[in-house]
Amino acid sequence: MKNILLALLLFLNISVQAQQLVQGIIKDTETNKPIQYVMIIGNVSGKSTVTNSEGRFQFNLPAQDSKLIIKHIDYFTQELSAKDKKSFNVQMQSSTESLEEIVILKTSIKDEIEKAIKTSQEKFAKNLKLNTFYRELLYINETMYKYEDAEVDYYLQSINKNNVIVKESRSVKFSNETAKKFDSLSNIQYYWDDFKDNVLYEFNYQLIKNIISDKEYDLYITAKTAGDGTELYVLNFNPIDNAKKATLSGTMIYGAHDYLIREIKANLSEKYITNNEFTQQNNHRFKRSFYNRTTIFNLFNSNYTLAYTSYRIFGVSQVADQFTKVGGVMELLIDSIEENTTIPNQEKFYTRRNLTPLGKNYKTKYWEKFNVVPLTFKEEQMLKDINK
């Protein structure tokens, strides 16, 4: 028994030492401003994370990785030695010095983008298991109301079908005065859309499909060269001048030769923000005042996969004659991917729309093993009690 216990302790010690936590901040060389959505990739493992709005990142460096690849579409790629180093202050040089040129196609833009979508979907391996870190943060009347996160395995049989297993999770509602007042006045429970559908939505490129099919959007394509030398095309979309309902502006970036989609970004167009209307949700009507969505795909050693997606949405909720400011953050970070995985028994799959019913459903500090994208400094200060 002692030998077994000793072996177990030794194994645990080796597992902890097998990766080291490195942290850093990345800024623009010329402006000294932080750069968001920079990808940090292990040079052998291919594991990745991204920087937050403050340019900060943290990365559990696997033992086989000796370097970090620092990569952003608008900046020159860097490789940094990670040996015996725990913190980084990185300056990146912009690679976008010239204006992007308009691309004249031999086909329609809709056909061009549909080709990029089809090519990207065909590149995804079939029968996947994605080990992910999922997080959502809910604000009520501009005050933090609820926080949830989880280690979730997404099992994809195809780009149209998946199931999930929630391995461990946390759901915490804050007890500040704003939360107490809201609870005393309302029985409405706010939550993000079904978290089980997050991966399918991204693999289907549903937002882009909607945009290119909507006649209220002006579409054009430009060409640029990424910081690593890859030639890229950029789909630009904005509401047309007389748009009545269209509200989003953004880009979709894909390879000019391989047609693989690298990045999708969308924001509310300031010029057409008045087009926002109240829309019926599950249990209330909602009108957006802020919308920011970013999805990043990673092509590493010929393997193409979803790497990260995030949403920040704020607005006003209406229930009868009661109006409430509601919004928050949703993030999904893919940690590892297995191909041709065995599908678990059906009874192990989670079927609820959100994590709230699970409460505090964990035995380990699972969030520490992921390359979790740091929250803003203000949000982290408010969440300190949760991580104890």
Give the label of every model feature segment.
Residues M1-I25, I40, L99, K388:
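Bacterial Sec-dependent N-terminal signal peptides
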Residues L21-I35:
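Structural motif
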Residues N32, Q58-D65:
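Short Pro-Gly-centered beta-turn/loop motif in secreted/extracellular proteins
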Residues S45-R56:
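Short, acidic Ser/Thr/Gly-rich low-complexity loop/linker segments typical of extracellular
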Residues E54-L61, S87:
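Short, surface-exposed beta-strand/beta-hairpin micro-motifs centered on an aromatic residue
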Residues I70-L80:
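A short, solvent-exposed loop/turn motif at the edges and junctions
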Residues Q93-D218, A226-E231, N283-K388:
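Surface-exposed, low-complexity/disordered segments
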Residues D111, Y205-A256, L260-A266:
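Extended beta-strand-rich segments in extracellular/periplasmic secretory proteins, especially
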